[in-house]
Amino acid sequence: DCPELQAVLDEYHKPVVIQDQVLGELTLDKDYDTFEGEIQWCGKDVSLSLEVNAESKPSWTRARSAAKKLLADCETWDKAMRELAAKNLTELANNWLSQDEENPRDPETDPITEEELTRRISLTSLSVTSGGSFTAWFDCDEMFTDHAVTVYGSLKKGLKTANIEG
C-alpha cells in the first residue's frame, strides 16, 4: 500500500457537486467528463448532461451558461425541435408503420401526420457542450419501435438535423 497514492485516489473519488440556481444539483461523472442532473423543460422532468473538461472549471461555466440559455427559451427550442423532427421523419415513420405487422394501422389510409409526430414525441434527455452545441433525445411513443428521435443543434447556428437512433 502507498498512502500518498491512496490519498490522491481518495481525492479523485470525492463527488464533485454544483448547486446551480437554475439547473439544480449537478454531479460530475469523472469517467465521462459530464455533469449530470435533472431539469424542468417546459414543465417536464428531463435528464441534463453537460459535456465538460473535468480539469477545466471554465468549461463547466460555459456548459452551464449554454444550458441556461436553452432552458430560458425552452418553449421556442422545443417547438422548433419537434417541427424539425416531424419535417425530417414523418415519411420514415410511415415507412416503419407499413412494415410493422403487429400494428393494425394502415399508413395508406391513416398515415402519421407531421402534426401527430410533433405531438407524440417528448423530450427525455438533453446534452449540452461547453461550446454551446446540444443533442436532444425524444421518446417517440413507439413510432420507431424502441428507437429514439435525436435532434442536433447549437446556440450559434440553430438546429442542424433530426435522426432516429438507438
Feature-to-residue mapping (PLM):
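Acidic, proline/glycine-rich low-complexity IDRs
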Residues: 1-28, 32-36, 111-166
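Contiguous hydrophobic, core-forming segments of folded domains
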Residues: 2-77
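Long, charge-rich alpha-helical interaction segments
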Residues: 52, 57-113, 117
